[in-house]
Structure formats: structure tokens, C-alpha cells
Amino acid sequence: MAKGGFPGGFNINNMIKQAQQMQEEIKKMQEELMQKTVEATVGGGMVKAVANGRKELVSIEINPAVVDKDDVETLEDLVLAAVNQALRNAEEMIASEMAKITGGLNIPGLF
């Protein structure tokens, strides 16, 4: 049996090293995701929401043509749809980046 190992070739020291390396890669990725953005545009380009890789809203752009004081509800719906889609896009971006590091393993609690 190898030093630090278990029957069957399992080596706890190697596993710890791999976990530490993955942790460092995840930290680096989190820093990189802060700089990346995704966007969502709804209403034929009338409302655009931009989110970063921390699922934070960075900006909202509203075309003045969609602003109607007699129909605020439509604008509210468009803003809500754009924000929700931008946040979903951020989730997908994060999942894609995480899969590169974890090899597709779903590790709860990382984000």
C-alpha cells in the first residue's frame, strides 16, 4: 500500500492536492467572472439589461419610445423580463465556466 494511500490505489494526499488546486482555479474564475457581462434585450430592443458573472445587474437601458405615462405596466413588464433573462444568462455563463473547472461535476454551494 502506498504511503498515505488506501487499498485499491486511493491516495488521500493526491485528493487533497486536487481539491486545493480546484479551489484556486475557482477563485481565479470568480475574479474573471466579475469582469464578464451578459445581456438580455426584450421588446424588440426597447429594454436591455446587463448582468455580470456575480449575478449583479450592471445596467439597464430603456428606449425612450417605450416610455408611456399612460401605460407604465408595459414598461414594468419589459424591465422585469429583461432583468430576469439577464440573470438567467449569467447563471448559464457561470455554469459553463464551472463545468470547465469541475469537469461537469455539480458541486453544491460553489455559487
Swiss-Prot record:
Q: Does the keyword Cytoplasm apply?
A: yes
The principal location of this protein is cytoplasm
Location in or out of the cell = Cytoplasm, Nucleoid
One Gene Ontology cellular component annotation held by this UniProt entry: bacterial nucleoid
Read off the InterPro entries from this record.
YbaB-like_sf (IPR036894), YbaB/EbfC (IPR004401)
GO MF, one term, reads:
DNA binding
Keywords for this entry? Cytoplasm, DNA-binding
Which Pfam families does the record associate with it?
Answer: YbaB_DNA_bd
The answer, when asked if DNA-binding is one of the entry's keywords, is: yes
> What SUPFAM superfamilies does the record tag this protein with?
YbaB-like (SSF82607)
Quote the subunit structure annotation.
Homodimer.
Free-text function comment from the UniProt entry: Binds to DNA and alters its conformation. May be involved in regulation of gene expression, nucleoid organization and DNA protection.
Family named by the database record: Belongs to the YbaB/EbfC family.
Q: Which HAMAP family match?
A: DNA_YbaB_EbfC (MF_00274)
Concerning PANTHER family, the annotation shows: NUCLEOID-ASSOCIATED PROTEIN YBAB
Q: What protein am I looking at?
A: Nucleoid-associated protein Teth514_0034
